[in-house]
């Protein structure tokens, strides 16, 4: 909740900063998790791998060259973990993009929201992979578009353009499938400005979302038991 406070200055500055929230949001969210393991906020991908022995791959989208960038301890060892996490989640209009060496990094979901194909490239045994996938429509298993109305703000218009473009691009990419997939369904698109505001301000809604995720996981586990 403390990470997403919005004031008038932020709204005015977002015109030049290209977003409402900067990397401080990521630091606020992950600080207690890292400190619980006695890890520094400035920990690099290489250092995090040495600590965890987890081959973590994070995907971001570089806007100027219009390409997906895969980041790990082998490709970008000296980049800070929190910086890379910020790059991968910078939804246009909401989060300030990370700009390094004339490259503009935004949410990796533009072309790679669910990097299953990349995972199978490195690990071909589908039985060893567990996917966790979100979807807004249980019947079509697709993401819902966001609508612009006469009451929509400029920020909501930008978010709508971003999300709907991402949805269209994702639908054109051929995706592999695996049996071991936890499908998490939500009632509405959680990336609209209204949904983000409500989830930040409404503690009960956050509990409901967590419970929905738990229910989806239990439903998946029940199918495993039957097998």
Predicted segments with their positions:
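Patatin-like phospholipase
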Residues: 1-227
């Amino acid at each position: 909740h403390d990470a997403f406070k919005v004031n008038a200055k932020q709204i005015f500055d977002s015109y030049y900063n290209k977003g409402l929230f900067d990397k401080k949001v990521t630091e606020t969210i992950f600080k207690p998790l890292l400190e619980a393991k006695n890890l520094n906020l400035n920990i690099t991908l290489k250092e995090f791998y040495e600590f965890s022995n987890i081959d973590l791959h994070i995907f971001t989208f570089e806007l100027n060259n219009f390409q997906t960038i895969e980041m790990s301890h082998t490709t970008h060892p000296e980049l800070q973990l929190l910086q890379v996490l910020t790059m991968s989640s910078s939804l246009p209009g909401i989060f300030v993009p990370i700009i390094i060496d004339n490259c503009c990094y935004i949410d990796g979901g533009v072309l790679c929201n669910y990097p299953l194909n990349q995972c199978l490239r490195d690990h071909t045994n589908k039985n060893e992979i567990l996917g966790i996938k979100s979807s807004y429509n249980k019947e079509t298993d697709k993401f819902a578009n966001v609508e612009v109305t006469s009451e929509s703000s400029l920020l909501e218009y930008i978010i709508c353009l971003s999300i709907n473009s991402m949805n269209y691009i994702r639908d054109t990419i051929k995706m592999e499938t695996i049996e071991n997939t936890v499908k998490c369904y939500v009632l509405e698109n959680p990336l609209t400005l209204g949904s983000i505001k409500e989830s930040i301000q409404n503690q009960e809604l956050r509990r409901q979302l967590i419970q929905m995720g738990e229910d989806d996981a239990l439903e998946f586990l029940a199918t495993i038991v039957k097998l």
